[in-house]
Regions:
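Active-site bordering "gate/hinge" segments
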Residues: 17-265
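A short, compositionally biased
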Residues: 203-209, 279-281, 367-373
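Oxyanion-binding "anion nests"
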Residues: 247-295
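Bacterial Sec-dependent N-terminal signal peptides
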Residues: 1-21
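Intrinsically disordered terminal and processing segments
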Residues: 347-390
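Short, glycine-/Ser/Thr-/acidic-enriched flexible segments
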Residues: 55-56, 119-121, 164, 217, ...
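Dual-mode signal for accessory low-complexity, basic/Gly-rich regions
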Residues: 265, 278, 294-359, 375
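Short, solvent-exposed amphipathic alpha-helical segments in soluble enzyme
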Residues: 64-69, 227-229, 238-239, 284-286, ...
Length: 390
C-alpha cells in the first residue's frame, strides 16, 4: 500500500519485493546523486532520514554520502524480512498499542525522508492476525498526523515495480524484462512526464463526472468537480506544509486526486487482486453514494474480508483516483503486471487519502489497479481501451 504514507522507521508493515540494485547493473553513484540533488533537492543543514533493505546497503551508503556532500546530515537505518517478521512473532502483542516515542522525535527532527523499497517475501506476514495491523496503525496515527502537518519531503524508490524474481514471478514475466522496464522508467525524461500530466490534469479539471468502464463488468462513476490533481513527475514541488507535491515516487508518472466524497456509484471488477501473497480472482466491489457496500469474488476472499472488517469505518469510503502516465511502462501481453504508473492504467482507492491532500483519515487504505479500461470525463475520453490519450 504505497499511498498510505505510514512512517515505520524500523518496521514497514506493508512489504514489497526487493532486489539488490547492484545486481541490476545500475550506476549506484549516479542514481544516488540524482535522488539527492534532483528528486529531493537536499540543501545545507537538512536532516535526512534514509531507510531501506540490507541488500541495498551500497546504494543507501551512496545516498548518505551525497547528502553529507551537500552539507546536510544523514540518518541511515536498514531493515530485512527477518527483522520485519520477528518484530511480529517475537515482540509481545501488548506493545502493538504503544506509541513510538522514537518515531515522534524523528518526525520532529527530519526535513526529508528517502526510502528504498524493502522486503522480498510475498505473504511474509500473511499469517499475522489483522487485528495486530489495526492496533499498530492506530498507535502510529499520532506520528502520521504530525508527519502530515509537517513540510517533510519524501522520495520513495520502488513504486510497486522494484525488480526481483519474486515480483517478476507475480507479474508472470522474466526478471530481466521487469528490470529493464524499471530502470528505463527511472531514467526517462521527467519533463515529458510533466507535459503529459499537465494535459491530463487540464482535462480532469474541466469536467464534472469521471466514468470508468471495462469489458470485465466494471461500470463506475464519481464526481470530480473542483478537485485538484497532483502530478508525480519525479520532482519535489515548492508546496506548503502538508502539500501532496512534496512526495516523490520513483519510477514517476502519475496524476492523482481525491474525488468528491460520497459520489462514487457503480461496480469495480478486478480479474485478479493480490492480497497478502494470495491471488483473488474475479473480485467485485460495489459502491453506493461513495461507500463500499459489498465485495465478492470467484475465489476465496475470507482473508481479505477479515482484514477489511477489522478496520475503521472510514476504510469503506471511495477516496482516491490515480492515473498512470509513464509511457516507458507497458503491460506485456499475457503478463499480470498491476501497478500505478503504466500509461493507461487507473488505480482506484478506498480509505486514507492523505497522499492526495484528501480528508479521509482512516488508519488504513486499499488500492485497486485496473488496466484496459475506458475512462471519460463527462463525454471526453482520457483513456480508450487501456490507452492513455495525450
Amino acid at each position: 500500500m504505497k499511498k498510505l504514507i505510514v512512517i515505520f522507521f524500523l518496521l514497514p508493515l506493508f512489504v514489497q519485493a526487493q532486489l539488490s540494485t547492484k545486481s541490476a547493473g545500475t550506476d549506484l553513484e549516479a542514481l544516488a546523486k540524482n535522488i539527492v540533488n534532483q528528486c529531493a533537492d537536499i540543501q545545507e543543514n537538512e536532516i535526512v532520514f534514509i531507510n531501506g533493505d540490507t541488500r541495498d546497503i551500497e546504494l543507501l551508503e551512496d545516498i548518505a554520502v551525497n547528502v553529507r556532500k551537500n552539507g546536510a546530515f544523514p540518518l541511515l537505518t536498514v531493515s530485512s524480512d527477518r527483522l520485519t517478521r520477528k518484530m511480529f512473532t517475537e515482540v509481545p502483542e501488548k506493545y502493538d498499542t504503544q506509541l513510538s516515542i522514537l518515531n515522534m522525535e524523528v518526525v520532529k527532527m527530519m526535513t526529508t525522508q528517502i526510502s528504498v523499497t524493502s522486503g522480498d517475501t510475498p505473504g511474509l506476514l500473511a499469517d499475522i492476525p489483522p487485528e495486530r495491523f489495526v492496533a499498530r496503525n492506530k498507535a502510529q496515527k499520532p506520528v502520521n498526523d504530525l508527519y502530515r502537518e509537517s513540510s517533510i519531503k519524501s522520495v520513495q524508490l520502488g513504486n510497486g515495480l522494484y525488480p526481483t524474481k519474486n515480483r517478476a514471478a507475480q507479474f508472470e514475466m522474466p526478471v530481466d524484462q521487469l528490470s529493464k522496464m524499471f530502470w528505463d522508467a527511472i531514467n526517462m525524461d521527467y519533463n515529458k512526464l510533466t507535459t503529459i500530466g499537465e494535459k491530463l490534469s487540464k482535462n480532469l479539471t474541466s469536467g464534472n463526472t469521471l466514468k470508468i468502464v471495462h469489458d470485465n463488468g466494471t461500470n463506475l462513476s464519481v464526481k470530480i468537480a473542483d478537485c485538484t490533481p497532483y502530478i508525480s513527475d519525479g520532482k519535489v514541488s515548492a508546496d506548503k506544509p502538508g502539500g501532496a507535491g512534496r512526495f516523490v515516487y520513483l519510477p514517476a508518472g502519475e496524476v492523482f486526486f481525491a474525488p468528491v466524497a460520497g459520489t462514487a456509484n457503480g461496480t469495480l471488477v478486478l480479474d485478479q487482486f493480490l492480497f497478502r501473497g494470495k491471488t483473488i480472482k474475479g473480485l467485485k466491489l460495489v459502491f453506493e453514494d461513495g461507500k463500499l457496500t459489498s465485495m465478492e469474488a470467484k475465489s476465496d476472499i475470507e482473508t481479505l474480508k477479515d482484514y477489511y472488517d477489522a478496520q475503521d469505518d472510514l476504510l469503506a469510503e471511495f477516496s482516491f483516483v490515480d492515473f498512470g502516465i509513464n509511457p516507458k511502462i507497458t503491460v506485456p501481453e499475457g503478463s499480470k503486471l498491476y501497478t500505478y504508473i503504466p500509461a493507461g492504467t487507473i488505480t482506484l482507492g478506498i480509505g486514507n487519502n492523505f497522499f492526495a491532500n484528501g480528508d479521509n483519515n482512516s488508519n488504513a487504505s486499499m488500492d485497486f489497479h485496473l488496466a484496459g479500461s475506458t475512462v471519460t470525463v463527462d463525454n471526453t475520453a482520457v483513456i480508450e481501451k487501456g490507452k492513455l490519450i495525450y
